[in-house]
Amino acid sequence: MADVLTELPGVGPSTAEKLIEAGYLDFMKIATSTIGELTDIEGISEKAAAKMIMAARDLCDLGFKSGVELLKQRQSVWRLSTGSKELDTVLAGGLESQSVTEFAGMYGSGKTQIMHQTCVNLQMAEKIFADLEGVVEEEMENPKAVYIDTEGTFRPERVVQMAEGAGIDGQTVLDNTFVARAYNSDMQMLFAEKIEDLIKGGNNIKLVIIDSLTSTFRNEFTGRGKLAERQQKLGRHMATLNKLADLYNCIVLVTNQVAAKPDAFFGVAEQAIGGHVVGHAATFRFFLRKSKGDKRVAKLYDSPHLPDSEAVFRITEKGIQD
């Protein structure tokens, strides 16, 4: 591996080892990094970092693509069922890979339940292969999920209950789900960055969940004086998640807290935390709200190609259903 990296200008065996230790295992990781990220590694100057990045981009053939090439790339997108046919219809078939989907809502609106359900659905072959088109089957072999829990709400027993409701083995779902408990934003960001290490180690990560995205940032950066710092850090975190989705054709799901809008006279009286940073970085954005009994309403209000729409689903002992 070190021998491969030495093909880059200014990278000798010693620098190659430092890059590998820092998690830069291939040209693509270097090509999609910033100069600032590489200069954090001891012994790498800004000039050297710039040369490495440009050379890596040439080797990876990064640059402009025609619309036809992008259309072909879109054919590798696959979709995963949410468990609700009505919600899947709003999403034109299910949760989409190569994208970040946000579910925001008040407590009890069903955010964490959807996250648990997707871990189960990932292990159901008929769900995965429902809309594969150009995806190679080997790419989807033994798919695994990563669940970064920032609020202590992941419940393995609930996953088992949902799996049994779906007719599959709960232990299999848990065996294929990596869980990390993040107590602060630094841990949360580190776990997200370490996902590439899991992939390089031979784990076929196809689902990444952050539950919830903004709680640690919200707790640490209080007051308007720290808002800019919080947003910059949150922006870097979202960039990491988008990169994972694009490079590894995986689905990224994030839940988000909401804040009241006291000046709202009509429409939704809450807004998702994170402002424009999250709004621009998320591909699909949902608001969840409670309805009668076990019913919940999911409203899609932002998407690059789908219309605004709503779906009603239920949270039962067996999981997410219509």
Curated annotation (Swiss-Prot):
It comes from the Archaea. PROSITE patterns: RECA_2, RECA_3. This is DNA repair and recombination protein RadA. InterPro entries: AAA+_ATPase, DNA_recomb/repair_Rad51_C, DNA_recomb/repair_RadA, DNA_recomb/repair_RecA-like, DNA_repair_Rad51/TF_NusA_a-hlx, Hlx-hairpin-Hlx_DNA-bd_motif, P-loop_NTPase, RecA_ATP-bd. ATP binds at G105, M106, Y107, G108, S109, G110, K111, T112. Keywords: ATP-binding, DNA damage, DNA recombination, DNA-binding, Nucleotide-binding. Involved in DNA repair and in homologous recombination. Binds and assemble on single-stranded DNA to form a nucleoprotein filament. Hydrolyzes ATP in a ssDNA-dependent manner and promotes DNA strand exchange between homologous DNA molecules. It comes from Methanococcus maripaludis (strain C5 / ATCC BAA-1333). SUPFAM superfamilies: P-loop containing nucleoside triphosphate hydrolases, Rad51 N-terminal domain-like. GO terms for biological process: DNA recombination; DNA repair. Belongs to the eukaryotic RecA-like protein family. GO terms for molecular function: ATP binding; ATP hydrolysis activity; ATP-dependent DNA damage sensor activity; damaged DNA binding.
